[in-house]
Amino acid sequence: YLVDLDKNIQVYTKSGSGPSKNVGTGECVIGIGFLHDGITQIIDNGYDNIELIIPSSGTSCEIGATAIFKGAAHPNAAKLWIEYALSPDCVNLAAQNGSYQFLVIDNATQPEVAAEFGLDPENVMDYDFDDATKNIKTYVEEVMNALAASGANTGDENRFQVK
């Protein structure tokens, strides 16, 4: 499937917002990416030529992270920041600042615009994060090897922006 699909792929980007930006600017007609990135292009950048299509089988998701570095100069201040960053008071500011993801913080208010575009926190595919973490290198190598075997120039850094 991916080898056949490759014939229609302009660029593989590691940028989550890249596909929706490319559609918005007219560089391509279809982009596969995260829905919240598409919403950002529509709401914040005014690209009214983007239509979001949500698979009935569920959407993918990403997990943001925050951390305190070992040996941080001010670990107590860092702990206070993380407590605030994970509070409803902070995450409720997300949509006001161009972040339209569904929130996972208890008692946080979901961005209204996300629901208006059809995002549904109950419509998320069953995703095995442990398997993906453990096997990502293998899965990427399998796809890249299959593409190379089909004749795709996987060394083309303009098309395969994955490093």
Q: PLM features: residue spans?
A:
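Conserved C-terminal helix/tail region of periplasmic/extracytoplasmic solute-binding proteins
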Residues: 119-163
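Soluble non-cytosolic domains of exported or imported proteins
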Residues: 13-17, 71-76, 88, 129-137
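Sec-exported extracytoplasmic/periplasmic mature domains
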Residues: 6-10, 24, 28, 73, ...
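Extracytoplasmic/secreted proteins, especially bacterial periplasmic and envelope-associated proteins
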Residues: 4, 18, 22, 27, ...
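Mature extracytoplasmic/periplasmic domains
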Residues: 59-60, 64, 69-126, 159-160
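Residues at the C-termini of beta-strands that transition into short coil/loop
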Residues: 56
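Ligand-binding pocket segment of bilobal, Venus flytrap-like solute-binding proteins
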Residues: 1-53
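Residue-level detector of short coil/turn "hinge" positions at structural boundaries
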Residues: 9, 30, 49, 101-102, ...
